[in-house]
Structures are given as C-alpha cells and as structure tokens.
Amino acid sequence: MLTDGYARFRETGFPRHEGAYRALAEGQEPPVMVISCCDSRVDPEAIFDAGPGELFVVRNVANLVPPCDPGGDYGTGAAIEFAVEGLGVADIVVMGHSGCGGIRAYIESRGAPPGESGAPGFIGKWISTVRGAEARLPTDAPSDGPGLQEAFEYASIRNSLDNLMTFPIVRQAVDDGRLRLHGAHFSIADGLLTVLDPATGNAAVPE
C-alpha cells in the first residue's frame, strides 16, 4: 500500500506541487497550527484542502493540550512553542472529532483517583487531561451513551483552548493580537465541521 501510494505521489502528486516543494525546501512559514487527533479517519490536510506547507499539524490521542507544566508532558508543549515562537503562526485550531476513542476511554474510566484515568499505560496517563473537561460539560448533558460522548468531545476542545492560554508565549501572543485560538469538531459520518464561537462557546457549521 505505501509503495503504491509513493509511486502515485511521484507520478502525479509531486509534479502538481513541485514549485511549492522547491520553495519549501528553503523553509516553512505555515500560517496555521492544527492540533488534531491521531485517529486515521481525521486528516486535517484533507479536511481543509491544504497543500504542502500550509498547515503545521500536531496529532495526538484525543487532540489534547495539557496545561503548561515545564516538568510535565512536553511533546505537545514543544510543538506549541515552536509554532508560536519559531514559525509565528497567526492561528491555532484545536480540532476534535466524532467517535473519539480517547474520549471514550476516559468516559469508561471515570471515577479514578485524581491524576489517574483508570485506563492502563501511557494512554491512561495521557487521557487524564480530559478530567479538566468535566467542569465544561453543559448542565443538560446526557448521563451516558452517544450524547455524553459528544458532549465530552466538545468540552474537551474547550478545555484544551483554556489550557493553551496557560502557556505564557500563547497568552502573550493572544494579548498582543498576533495569535487567535479556535475550536472545531469534525463529524466523520457526514464530513461536517462545526466551529466554536469564541465568545459564546456555541458550535455552528461555517457557511
């Protein structure tokens, strides 16, 4: 599969963007950072119809941004620092999606002690970040089932946006008007993207 895909890239993909690739060999200046889930069904470049060099994409389980902690999880934090300080991106988008396995794992393990998720291994430690989304659930959120899953997906996006603002470099860039933060949610079944209103937190499909 990979070999065949590379052959198609060399035959049609690279020639179509050859000029862009040659320019990008000198460096990158993507205007947008996207923090997305590593789920194979959610491809930011495809969803936003972006070409080479247009998006700086970071993917992790459940598209999470942990709070800034120099002694804690640093992978996503390093990417944020590089995007804001090194690349000077103007926008950061946290994009969740329907049927997120990381969110589902957190829901199934609720009730674990603080700082733990109840799930095993690295995944368990990582998704404990979702705990911060509990306070952002709407008061009328369903208590279980697909409705609770979706409510947590949106609440977790809002939580990650709040956590972004705990990074001093992000807060400074936002306060200076150099950086904007956005939340979005992709529905896999129908290909619809909903965007969170930064003022109200409400979600709507962009026109």
Question: What is the predicted function of each stretch?
Answer:
Residues 40-62:
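Catalytic core of membrane glycerolipid acyltransferases/transacylases, capturing the structured
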Residues 1-30, 53, 63-90, 101-207:
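Divalent-metal-activated hydrolytic enzyme cores
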Residues 39-41, 97-102:
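Gly/Ser/Thr-rich loops at beta-strand to alpha-helix junctions
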Residues 25-44:
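N-terminal low-complexity or amphipathic/hydrophobic leaders
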Residues 35-37, 59, 93-97, 182-187:
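Short beta-strand segments
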